[in-house]
Amino acid sequence: MSRYRGARLRIVRQFDLKQTLRGLTRKRTDNRCMPGQHRKKRNDSTKKTKNSKKVAQYQIRLQEKQKLRFNYGITESQLINYVRQARKTKGSTGETLLQLLEMRLDNIVFRLGMAPTIPAARQLVNHGHIVVNNKKVDISSYQCQSQDVISVTKNKTIRTLISNFINSKTPKNLLRNPQIPSHLIFNKSTLLGTIKSVVPRRWIGLKIKELLIVEFYSRKA
């Protein structure tokens, strides 16, 4: 399954989220109808069947998995690989999975406030504008470690672009830039960020039930 490149608010409406997928889009929406031509109501009654409970449980797990995938902008195969990697690590599989995704370079650039969304941060990385420990890294899935130093290349145009975004006022129709989490340090004047430690669970950039995702992949990954 390829990476999603379609309408982003459509995904937010699909999940009926009161808070948007912050990594995917900054835009707000008050439209609570399902996306599509006929705008199906969410509370429409459906006939109960013997398998309705089983289907409902599967649907809940699937939705949590899709929320995670869309927020971080990863493919299905990438997510499966992260789940397998998390299982090999000691501790909670769900929490380790979230930490692996949070420590991706594109997400770190986003959480430092240098880009409005994770896709925008991924562009900065892929185009070679991000430096890790004084070495240019153009792989968005690069796994950052504690004490890594993240900076921007000496390209004046890019540095000006990032500085203007950081210092700009947020329009009313967009969400404000999120607070920089406790495990990161960022100097706005030098555009220099440092990773102090692995991200704590309470600073994960998405409200999600990771246990449901682990259960979803219990027989697949």
From Swiss-Prot:
Record-annotated S4 RNA-binding domain positions: 103-161
Keywords of this entry: Chloroplast, Plastid, Ribonucleoprotein, Ribosomal protein, RNA-binding, rRNA-binding
Region (Disordered), start-end ranges: 26-53
Biased composition (Basic residues): 37-53
A GO molecular function held by the record: structural constituent of ribosome
GO cellular component, one term: small ribosomal subunit
Compartments reported by the entry: Plastid, Chloroplast
GO biological process, one term: translation
Function: One of the primary rRNA binding proteins, it binds directly to 16S rRNA where it nucleates assembly of the body of the 30S subunit.
Record note on quaternary structure: Part of the 30S ribosomal subunit. Contacts protein S5. The interaction surface between S4 and S5 is involved in control of translational fidelity.
Family named by the database record: Belongs to the universal ribosomal protein uS4 family.
Protein name according to UniProt: Small ribosomal subunit protein uS4c
Gene: rps4
